Amino acid sequence: MTADSLPGAGGAVGPCVVQYDVTNPGAEPFTYTITFSLMDEQGRAMSNVEETVASVGAGKTVRRTLEHGGYPGGGVLDAGRVRILDVERVPSDEAPAPASSCPASGLRLTADQGDAAMGLRVVGLHLENCGSRTYSLEGYPVLQLLDAEHQPVDGIEILRGTDGIPMAGGDEGPPRPVTLRPGESAVSGLAWRNTTEFGEAVTVPYVRVRAEAGADPVTVAPHLDLGTTGELGVRPWRKDETGAGRGTGDSGSGRPGAQGPYGMPSSS
């Protein structure tokens, strides 16, 4: 990264501009989500900033600018006060659609940031009908677990329902038909336990999700820390009567907020 000070209004020195480069070494376009930590002069983390760089072409490098006028650390923000906490990348044609757009399918599929307590992990999946026609589905999302290189992860049993996941509730019942009119949403979810015993712990950074068999895939980044359990529970689609699933964040990753039909965080 490189940094340059830019003049503010009236010629005053404004907040420093930090520029960063994103290089895609892959053979297809990727969309990157980068989380930056902004620090004060003592190196203490003050705030995090998340930026999405869409559709970086194969073998290409793009330069972007990180501007944070509300920098809380005092003084001038420069590259020495910025750290990269996390980088996620997904194929651009499988990236979650931002709230400002609607895919050709008329369905926007996203994952929220989830919740964790006493070894139990849950991540909500949200399906919004952002199109102009009614959409019906029944059953479970179709999942494919992927490693950091987007290759399939084997050896994990995907359970239909969460009865087999201790403390996950397991009260969702069998699948039933869901009808979504334009503007309505459905919610599903992933549940697992971060238990590590004998054997090698497994972490799954990415999950390719289809709302149902044959639907367009969307790759989300829930970072499943499965430990040595070898199991992941998936809940059936239910209509989101709270309306909380409407309008996810710009990067397509919702934020914990109102409770959905499974008592999990829903995007706001």
Give the residues covered by each predicted segment:
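Short, solvent-exposed loop/turn segments enriched in Ser/Thr/Gly
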Residues: 12-19, 117-124, 203
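Short beta-strands and strand-coil junctions in structured, solvent-facing domains, enriched
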Residues: 131-134, 195-197
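Asparagine-centered strand-capping/turn motif at beta-strand->loop junctions
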Residues: 21-26, 125-131
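Short acidic, flexible loop segments centered on an aromatic residue
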Residues: 27-44, 137-153, 157-161
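Terminal connector regions
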Residues: 49-50, 63-65, 69-108, 193-238, ...
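Ordered, small/hydrophobic-rich secondary-structure cores
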Residues: 1-63
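A structural motif detector for short, solvent-exposed N-terminal "entry" segments of globular domains
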Residues: 98-124, 128
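Intrinsically disordered, low-complexity Pro/Gly/Ser/Thr-rich segments with frequent PxxP/GP/PP motifs
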Residues: 43-74, 160-195
